[in-house]
């Protein structure tokens, strides 16, 4: 289904973090000059957008790049929550024509019900890969997250191009076992964990989100079992404002794990 064959090798992808915050960041209370995280979203090579949330155009405007999404013809949606999916953002992206949205069928219905038109929808089934016209292979993996729409599979993604790939693991609590098996098979060159919780013992959000102690446990297994590539780089996104201190504190907390917390506007090469 919509699968093309590409034989590129040694393709380096660039991932731009458009937002790195969880849903408790209030953009209406942002203070100019103070550190702020938008809702989590990412852009691959200025071509593939992951999660068209309500803050993506604010990122472009505040950074003086109003044409940032000019070449975006593919959008991949992890799940239906409002900090990750915004119908008005999709409509603006679709205005130029030729937009394809890769998502769970329940997400497609939500967007259609919100009046999104002029878009090609490609339904995603966990672990059945699809390839965009630009040659990005999207491997949808099951995530451990909720609540969700009736019948919705919430997703994480492995994004591949050529022989390079990365795992985008938000939103999710403990990584699902079948998703772990696919990570071991693909051996991604980078992993983006979500880190909503920070250190929150006794917080039941751990059943759908991730904190630093959970990342430490999963990382130990990933490295011991040679899941991601041996030289893989590890990052975090989706940090809650109310469950973390400063970004500098988070840098220090994650340093012993050799994990880098992302910030809005950060670029990495995969």
What are these regions (language model features)?
Residues 49-53, 71-83, 87, 102-105, ...:
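Active-site neighborhood of phospho(di)ester-bond hydrolases with catalytic His/Asp-centered motifs
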Residues 103-155, 160-162, 259-268:
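Metallo-beta-lactamase
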Residues 23-80, 86-92, 177-183:
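Pre-active-site segment of Zn-dependent metallo-hydrolases
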Residues 64-125:
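Active-site HxH/HxHxD metal-binding segment of metal-dependent hydrolases
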Residues 46-48, 95-100, 165-166:
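Short active-site oxyanion
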Residues 14-20, 49-51, 136-144, 165-172:
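Active-site-proximal beta-strand elements of phosphoester/diester hydrolases
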Residues 175-269:
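Cap/insert and terminal regions of metallo-dependent hydrolase folds
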Residues 2-12:
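Short, Lys/Arg-enriched N-terminal segments with co-localized hydrophobic residues
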């Amino acid at each position: 289904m919509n699968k093309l064959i590409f034989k590129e090798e040694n393709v380096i992808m660039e991932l731009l973090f458009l937002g790195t915050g969880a849903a408790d960041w209030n953009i209406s209370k942002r203070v100019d000059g103070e550190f702020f995280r938008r809702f989590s979203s990412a852009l691959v090579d200025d071509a593939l957008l992951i999660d068209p949330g309500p803050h993506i155009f604010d990122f472009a405007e505040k950074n003086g790049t109003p044409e940032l999404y000019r070449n975006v013809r593919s959008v991949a949606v992890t799940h239906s929550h409002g900090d990750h999916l915004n119908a008005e953002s999709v409509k603006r992206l679709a205005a130029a024509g030729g937009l394809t949205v890769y998502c769970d069928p329940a997400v497609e219905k939500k967007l259609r019900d919100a009046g999104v038109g002029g878009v090609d929808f490609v339904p995603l089934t966990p672990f059945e890969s699809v390839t965009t016209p630009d040659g990005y292979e999207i491997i949808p993996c099951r995530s451990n997250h909720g609540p969700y729409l009736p019948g919705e599979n919430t997703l994480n993604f492995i994004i591949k191009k050529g022989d390079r790939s990365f795992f985008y693991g938000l939103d999710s609590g403990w990584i699902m076992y079948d998703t772990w098996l696919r990570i071991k098979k693909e051996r991604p060159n980078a992993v983006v964990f979500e880190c909503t919780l920070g250190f929150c013992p006794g917080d039941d959000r751990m059943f759908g989100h991730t904190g630093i102690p959970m990342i430490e446990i999963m990382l130990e297994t990933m490295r011991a079992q040679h899941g991601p590539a041996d030289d893989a780089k590890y990052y975090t996104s989706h940090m809650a404002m109310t469950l973390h201190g400063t970004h500098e504190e988070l840098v220090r907390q994650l340093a012993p794990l050799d994990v880098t917390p992302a910030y809005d506007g950060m670029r990495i090469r995969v």
